[in-house]
Amino acid sequence: MGCTLSAEDKAAVERSKMIDRNLREDGEKAAKEVKLLLLGAGESGKSTIVKQMKIIHEDGYSEDECKQYKVVVYSNTIQSIIAIIRAMGRLKIDFGEAARADDARQLFVLAGSAEEGVMTSELAGVIKRLWRDGGVQACFGRSREYQLNDSASYYLNDLDRISQTNYIPTQQDVLRTRVKTTGIVETHFTFKELYFKMFDVGGQRSERKKWIHCFEGVTAIIFCVALSDYDLVLAEDEEMNRMHESMKLFDSICNNKWFTDTSIILFLNKKDLFEEKIKRSPLTICYPEYTGSNTYEEAAAYIQCQFEDLNRRKDTKEIYTHFTCATDTKNVQFVFDAVTDVIIKNNLKECGLY
């Protein structure tokens, strides 16, 4: 006698198949959506990484978008030279040429009345003369003793180009701009058939209370550390070494119960600045116990160990570390490719598809 299914049984089987199919599709959809949280102390390069994602995965900045950054380029340039001139007074550094004192006074007058997004030839001339001065250069060489944008020399060395009336910022100029991130900046892009949602969170202490809203369902955290911060203090607390602050923050993120199953990717950033700085500023400023040489390889490896040793779940949790230069598009492209492969593997495991 044949075994036939009743209409009710057939419907139940179909329902079961549909549920299985939906679960499978949901699993695949979850595997394809990646929520990336960019964390790290202030000025560690998080926003630059976000800009690189736009350049690498979204055809970069249009000419109109680049034009909008002209205001920021000029503001960063003017604020940088002003910061150096002010520091000269504090550090008791004299101008190489007495005539530059008049230029300094003129700088404050012209900067105060400058139209937004305009660099007059008079203002550009004053800044150029000041930047060439021996005393100003001596003060710039001591920039670890005060707060100065990383991009200061990049813009000041290129004043002839950026002060042209028809100047339009390049992609690299845009990458170098510094605007403090307040709140949460969200970026979406697709790469390797994954849909990325990247969240850039302000790194200053006052911004950190906003992070909590981003924690749910995070696939991976990219934690940015500025290697070159080892001899600097915080903008918001001049008693606190920036590297120590980063370590404290990484400890709290890496060992947080929220992130037990979250991939942690460590970007040891600004490797280019670190490579230059380590030749003249010893690592013992930050790590008095350090006995190695002040070479890039040895000092960078030591910092890497300091961070990775903070991981209290080494047996179950791996830290994926990369040395980066956030302003170098090729480097970021290469690193992000490797990061994505790790995310794909871990994400598929989570969904039971690997």
Swiss-Prot record:
One of its GO terms (biological process) is GTP metabolic process. Mg(2+) binds at residues 47, 181. A lipid is attached at residue 3 (S-palmitoyl cysteine). Transmembrane segments: none annotated. One of its GO terms (cellular component) is plasma membrane. A lipid is attached at residue 2 (N-myristoyl glycine). GTP binds at residues 42-48, 150-151, 175-181, 201, 203, 269-270, 272-273, 325-327. GO terms for molecular function: G protein-coupled receptor binding; G-protein beta/gamma-subunit complex binding; GDP binding; GTP binding; GTPase activity. Residues 265-272 are annotated as: G4 motif. Residues 35-48 are annotated as: G1 motif. The keyword Cytoplasm applies. It is a lipid-anchor. CDD domains: G-alpha. It is found in: Cytoplasm; Cell membrane; Cytoplasm, Cytoskeleton, Microtubule organizing center, Centrosome. SUPFAM superfamilies: P-loop containing nucleoside triphosphate hydrolases (SSF52540). Keywords: Cell cycle, Cell division, Cell membrane, Cytoplasm, Cytoskeleton, GTP-binding, Lipoprotein, Magnesium, Membrane, Metal-binding, Myristate, Nucleotide-binding, Palmitate, Transducer. Residues 32-354 form the G-alpha domain. SMART domains: G_alpha. Belongs to the G-alpha family. G(i/o/t/z) subfamily. Heterotrimeric guanine nucleotide-binding proteins (G proteins) function as transducers downstream of G protein-coupled receptors (GPCRs) in numerous signaling cascades. The alpha chain contains the guanine nucleotide binding site and alternates between an active, GTP-bound state and an inactive, GDP-bound state. Signaling by an activated GPCR promotes GDP release and GTP binding. The alpha subunit has a low GTPase activity that converts bound GTP to GDP, thereby terminating the signal. Both GDP release and GTP hydrolysis are modulated by numerous regulatory proteins. Heterotrimeric G proteins are composed of 3 units; alpha, beta and gamma. The alpha subunit contains the guanine nucleotide binding site. GTP binding causes dissociation of the heterotrimer, liberating the individual subunits so that they can interact with downstream effector proteins. Forms a complex with CCDC88A/GIV and EGFR which leads to enhanced EGFR signaling and triggering of cell migration; ligand stimulation is required for recruitment of GNAI3 to the complex. Interacts (inactive GDP-bound form) with CCDC88A/GIV (via GBA motif); the interaction leads to activation of GNAI3. This is Guanine nucleotide-binding protein G(i) subunit alpha-3. It comes from Cricetulus griseus (Chinese hamster). The lineage of its organism: Eukaryota, Metazoa, Chordata, Craniata, Vertebrata.
